Each structure stands twice: as structure tokens, then as C-alpha cells.
Amino acid sequence: MELLWLLLLLLMASSTSSRSEMKAGEVIRRSQFPEDFFFGTASSAYQYEGAVREGGRGPSIWDTFTHNHPEKIANGSNGDIAIDSYHRYKEDVGIMKGLGLNAYRFSVSWPRILPNGKLSGGVNLEGIKYYNNLIDELISKGVEPFVTLFHWDSPQALEQQYGGFLSNLIVEDFRDYADICFREFGDRVKYWITFNEPWSFSIGGYSNGILAPGRCSSQGKSGCSKGDSGREPYIVAHNQLLAHAAVVQIYREKYQGGQKGKIGIAIVSNWMIPYEDSKEDKHATKRALDFMYGWFMDPLTKGDYPVSMRTLVGNRLPRFTKEQSKAINGSFDFIGLNYYTARYIQGTKQDSNSHKSYSTDSLTNERVERNGTDIGPKAGSSWLYIYPKGIEELLLYTKRTYNNPTIYITENGVDEVNNENLSLKEALIDTTRIEFYRQHLFHVQRALRQGVDVRGYFAWSLFDNFEWMDGYSVRFGINYIDYKDGLKRYPKRSSQWLQNFLHN
């Protein structure tokens, strides 16, 4: 395997060296993509909807986390109101249509459908009505709905009852919830995504504690009162994969034949680059990809976790039964790929004295600079360095490693710091974002030309919104939200650029 990986790296290096970068002023056009290619924006329920105590919605773990631990969120903010898309969805869909977008990715709030998390606790008909109205509005405006079933906001009731995704009891409850969604919305929804970024939910929620439910080992820096960073992330990821497979099975058996839809999962990965041209760093780079991307892609395409994870994590990594492995292998019609940034990777030695943790298990060290130069321009968020070529490299890696699956880029975007000293006119000038999308679309188009089966691209995001631990301190939107004046929406220059792109 190691020899194959080294040969792959050499092949990628040779192909990369022959590639030209996008030239300044070079134009990327909609006409360079297939006619049936989807262009949309992505969102999630907790970040957009607000109305957390309206319409029969039950509490989610994010309601609990933001209110119990405001110190973990920038400015102690929360998503109680967010950008109020619950009440303003018609206005928002109108903005999409005006831009010329033909798709919209949003998530259903599990506790808005099942306030107590379980079927036995009752179905919230108001929640079903809201999503029916949103779906109908999208379709009436020619916008294809891509619906995510889980974007991190699991019901607080299940967290209290059995620990949420730490328990395999979640599989049956998630299946029941998904079954309702397929039954109620599947006649119009043709693209389903089971989970958004199971890596982020597992790591942020259970390894470093920066996301809900905020668990990690006490040795960490995040001040967690409960958790085990060496075990819980692997358990939670495992249960998400089992729940995903169970939901895909029920969709294929009960609904897909009649509804003619597709189902997949959205996986996030950084692109990884060896820090030095050494055997150690090249092997470490493969391990880094395994521990972020292969952790989910290997089970989905091969039925088991990467060998590197089995070797290094040992008995802390759960095992699939033969039946589970068979159910997970091939349990997708498409892969959603979320890409934002890249990292240099160094190999490290095993420290027998260190506490077991996901962050050290891969024996890798991430770097954002080499020889005093950053890997790319730094964006608003501390973790986001702009590296456009990485999206092409990750797509080509997926084609070579995982048998060229159908892919939708389900998230790609960049943020700026929310600078309250800027005037509204100044805040709408986002040339960095225009260049970000221009460069990334250029590299997606290059991947297409090299045979990658990419069929859509979703920008993150249509609007500025609640950005998890960053709260409202950063802005990812192509449209500006005025948090001081009734959440009014204003198009940034990137919105106008995207509109022009879609009409060329």
C-alpha cells in the first residue's frame, strides 16, 4: 500500500507541475460547465432559521450548548434568531431566483419534525408544514431542493435520554425521522444528504469540544467537563455511519423506486500536502487524508476503515459486523464534498506518555506555513487559508482512490471578519470572495475536463449567518445581513459577480 501511495504522489506531482494556474483577468463562464450542472448555495437549519421556540420545535443540542456555554461562542451569541429564514424564506428564495441559481441545499431540523427526537414523542405537523412550504416555494421558482437530514442539531431529548450519537440507539430514531421526511417530502425532493460533515461533528463535538455537545478529555484546552477524546470521536463517527446506512437502506427499499430520487452523504476534507519532500512526510500526508477523509470514504466504498486507522487506533476504533460492512459499502448514489482549505503535513513520532486522543493518533502535525510563507491567504476564520488548487487535487484524488463516484461540491466558501467600523457601502465590497469563487470554479472545471464526475457546486453561503463557534463575528455570505437593522439583506459584489457568471 505504501508503495502504491508513493507512486500516486509522484503521478500527482507530475500532473500538477504541468498545470497552469489561472491567469489574472481570465474569465470563467457558466457555459464551460455542462448544461445540467447545478449551481446553488448551501445553508443549515440552526444557522439560518431562527424561531427556535416557534412552530412546535423542540430544543436541539445547539440550543443547550450556546445557552449553557456562551463563553465557547464568539460574543456569547446563539442561533435563537439567526437570520430568521423561518419567517423570511419567500424573500430568500426570491433572491436565489434573481441570481439565476438552480439549486438550494438546506437542512431539516430534526427537533422541528420530532420535538422529542422519537416517533413515540409525536410528529410536529407545523414543522412538516414549514418545510413543505419552503420546498414548494423553491420548486415554483425553478430551484431544485437538496435536503440534508442532519446538520449537527440533534434533539436535546435524545442527548439526555441516552447520550445522543454516543449510543447506537440513535440509529433507529434517526431512521424513523428520515422515514417521515422521505414520506412527507420525497415526492418533490430528489436529492437527499443523510449527514453533513460527520468528521466535524465527531471532532468538534467529542475531540476538542468546540462544537455541541462540547465533550472532550479534561487534558484538552477547551475546558470540557466530560468526554474522552481518544474514544468518543470514533464511537460517534461509527454510529453516524451505521445510521447513514440504515437510512439509505430504508430509502432504497421503500421510496427510491417510486420517487426516483438520489441519496448521498456530505464529507469534508482539507487537501493535504507533504511539508518536505521526504518519505516520512509523504506517508504522514496519506495518514492525514485517511484520518479525515478515508475515515468515512473507505467504509462507504470498501466496507471498512483505513488500514492506517486500524493500526494506530487499535481497539478504540469500533468494528463493523459483516452485515454492517455490507450495508455501508456502496450506500450512496453520490458523494457531497465540502472543501475549504489545505494543510502541510509532517510526520511525528509516537509518544508513549501522551494521553490517547484523535488529535495525536495519526502521528501527523499540521502546518499552515512553510519556509516562512503561508500555504495561502488567510481568511476571516483562524482555520481558513485560501488554497484553490486543493479542490482540484482532492477531486482527482477521489477519482483515483474511490473509483470516480458522482460528486456534488456541497460547500465551498470564504469569510471575512465582521468589521463593524465599515460603512454598509464598504462592507459590500468583497473582492477576496469574488477571486475565491473565480479560482475555485476554474479548478472544478479543470477536474471536470480530467474526467471527474462532478455534477454541481454549492457556495457557502447565500447569506452571512451564525457560524458555530465564531457566532456572527465572521461573514461567509454573498449577501450581507444587517444585524443592526432588522436583518435586512443586501447583495455584496460577489453576488453580482455570481449572477453575471451564471448568465455567461
Curated annotation (Swiss-Prot):
A GO BP entry: carbohydrate metabolic process
Domain of life: Eukaryota
This enzyme's EC code(s): 3.2.1.21
Signal peptide (from-to): 1-18
Signal keyword on record: yes
Claim: Hydrolase is one of the keywords in the record: yes
Record's catalysed reaction(s): Hydrolysis of terminal, non-reducing beta-D-glucosyl residues with release of beta-D-glucose
Classification via PROSITE patterns: GLYCOSYL_HYDROL_F1_2
A Gene Ontology molecular function term of the record: beta-glucosidase activity
Keywords, sorted A to Z: Disulfide bond, Glycoprotein, Glycosidase, Hydrolase, Signal
Disulfide bonds: 216-224
Entry binding sites for a beta-D-glucoside: 47, 151, 196-197, 340, 411, 460, 467-468, 476
Gene3D superfamilies reported for this sequence: Glycosidases
Glycosylation sites: 75, 329, 371, 421
Catalytic residues (positions): 197 (proton donor), 411 (nucleophile)
InterPro entries assigned to the protein according to its UniProt record, in alphabetical order: Glyco_hydro_1 (IPR001360), Glyco_hydro_1_N_CS (IPR033132), Glycoside_hydrolase_SF (IPR017853)
Protein family (similarity comment): Belongs to the glycosyl hydrolase 1 family.
Protein name: Beta-glucosidase 24
Species in which this protein is naturally found: Oryza sativa subsp. japonica (Rice)
Source organism phylogeny: Eukaryota, Viridiplantae, Streptophyta, Embryophyta, Tracheophyta
Gene (name only): BGLU24
